[in-house]
Amino acid sequence: MNETQIQRETRQVVEDVLEKTNLKQGALFVLGLSSSEVLGGHIGKESSQEIGELIVETILDILGSRGIHLAVQGCEHVNRALVVERQVAEQFGLEIVSVHPTLHAGGSGQLAAFKFMQDPVEVEFIKAHAGLDIGDTAIGMHVKHVQVPIRPILREIGHAHVTALASRPKLIGGARAHYPQDAIRKF
């Protein structure tokens, strides 16, 4: 697999999703990543530390320049806990849990986050404003309500299927209520 192509596709998808979700500085962005799927394998079976590092470093660079916080979801072997910066965990009141990821428990994305973040910790659960799922890892449990599917400009990074989610405030009220327009809502 061509690493330059994977990096280019990752950059293109992330920038597109950020434009479509209109995330602001300080927002939380969750990443689910199967490096196995990126390489054309079965999720969890052919994990690649190199691919995890390439993708996470690329995303951290993009989000960091915009002041958006990255949370990297692990696999079910760590109960889908997430790696974030300690400062983010403290700022958002997130519960820190004790686990250190491995290639096959947490995954390549989490290992990369531990490598590239300043002071990484694992947290049990977040409510991110948006997120990107590379390889059908199921990030929905970590994106706040109301979730809105975002169609990325590319359907795949490498061989991995790509989906994205944004969120919007709940619409409350009744027939007489009025709602402000925003970039996410589809009416």
UniProtKB/Swiss-Prot annotation:
Family named by the database record: Belongs to the UPF0340 family.
The protein's name: UPF0340 protein SP_0663
Organism: Streptococcus pneumoniae serotype 4 (strain ATCC BAA-334 / TIGR4)
